[in-house]
Amino acid sequence: MFEQNLTSEALTVTTVTSQDQITQKPLRDSVKASLKNYLAQLNGQEVTELYELVLAEVEQPLLDTIMQYTRGNQTRAATMMGINRGTLRKKLKKYGMN
């Protein structure tokens, strides 16, 4: 097939400041900052199922973007994501994207 040279460092978030400065940072840094912000806003409240909450926040836009990129080709999308096509179909159904 082909050799995949991209690493997780390729997943970056680009932002433009009010002074028109462009910055890029790894996606993981944005996720970490968002989690810290979320936890700071809890004010001592207990939280459950945080893992599922975070996963849903990332997984749904991931699926949407990959399905658009593959023009709805589930086999290609599953291959790109490194998951079984049946697993992809379950995830699409979970988010009402089937």
Swiss-Prot record:
GO function terms (MF aspect): DNA-binding transcription factor activity; sequence-specific DNA binding
Superkingdom classification of source: Bacteria
Keywords recorded for this protein, A-Z: Activator, DNA-binding, Transcription, Transcription regulation
Keyword Nucleotide-binding attributed: no
SUPFAM superfamilies the record matches: Homeodomain-like (SSF46689)
Annotated family: Belongs to the transcriptional regulatory Fis family.
Protein name listed in UniProt: DNA-binding protein Fis
Lineage: Bacteria, Pseudomonadati, Pseudomonadota, Gammaproteobacteria, Vibrionales
